[in-house]
Amino acid sequence: MTTIDLNSDLGESYGSWVMGNDVAVLDLVSSANIACGFHAGDATVLFKTVRAAHARHVRIGAHIGYNDIAGFGRRNLDVAHDDLVAETIYQIGAIQAAAKASGAVVEYVKPHGALYNTIAVDEAQAAAVIEGIKLVNPELSLMALAGSQIVEQARAAGLQVEQETFADRAYTADGQLVSRKLPGAVLHDPETAARQALAFATGQPITAITGESVLVDANSICVHGDNPQALALVEKIVTTLAAHEVQVSHAR
C-alpha cells in the first residue's frame, strides 16, 4: 500500500482568539506543525496542542516563523543572519520544552508563511534557518517546499529534508505556489483539494492554475489549519486517499 504523510499547521490560536479546529484535524493527520509563538500561538496553546498531538500519536514539528504576530508571519522581513539564527533556536526551544513536559519529542522543523517562501529562494536566510536547526539538533529534519533551492542547500549541510506539497494551494506551470495575492491561490473546494492530494500521493501530475500538467515529487502533503474549510478538506482528502489504497502515515 502507498503511504503519504499528511500535515497541518496547528496551534495558531492565542489568547481569546481561536483559529481552526485543531483537535478534529489532529484525529486525521499524521504530522502537526505547531506554532511556536512568533507568528501565532501562545504558551498555553502550544502546550495544549503538543499534548493533544502526542495523545493521538501524531508527529510533532516546530512551525517557526518571523517575529510578526500582527501580520501572522506572512509579511516579508529582512532579518539579520544572527537574529534569524537566534529566533530559530528560540522557537524550537519553546516547543521542545513543551514536548519534554508532555513525554513527546519534536521530530522536524517547518517554517511558516513568508519565512517558508523566502528560504525557498533566498540562500542567505535559508542558511540562517539551517544553522539554527543544526545548533539545536542536527537530527531534526527540515520540511520545505518541494523542488525549491533550500532542499539541496539543507541536504548539503547535513540535514534530512522532507519535500512538501499543498493540497489547498494552486500551483504555477513551473511547480511553484501561486501567490496568495492572486485570485484562486487558495483552494477551498474539498473535491479539488482531494484530487490534488491524490495526485501528489500517487506520483501523478496536477493541473496548474493556467491549465498545464505539472509533476511535483514530495513525501508530505499540507492542509493549512487557518483555511476556513480545513476540516472538510482533510476529511475529504483522507477518505479519497483511503479509497485509492493510500495510507496516511508519517514521512519518516
From Swiss-Prot:
SUPFAM superfamilies in UniProt:
Glycoside hydrolase/deacetylase
Root EC class:
hydrolase
Q: Which reaction does it catalyse?
A: 5-oxo-L-proline + ATP + 2 H2O = L-glutamate + ADP + phosphate + H(+)
So what EC number does this one have?
Answer: 3.5.2.9
Q: List the InterPro entries hit by this protein, alphabetically.
A: Glyco_hydro/deAcase_b/a-brl, LamB/YcsF/PxpA-like
A UniProt-annotated Pfam family? LamB_YcsF
What do we know about how this protein assembles, alone or with others? Forms a complex composed of PxpA, PxpB and PxpC.
Annotated PANTHER family: 5-OXOPROLINASE SUBUNIT A, UNCHARACTERIZED PROTEIN YBGL-RELATED
The record's similarity note reads: Belongs to the LamB/PxpA family.
Question: What HAMAP family does the record tag this protein with?
Answer: PxpA
**Which named protein is this?**
5-oxoprolinase subunit A
Tell me which species this is from: Corynebacterium glutamicum (strain R)
Q: Taxonomic classification, please? A: Bacteria, Bacillati, Actinomycetota, Actinomycetes, Mycobacteriales
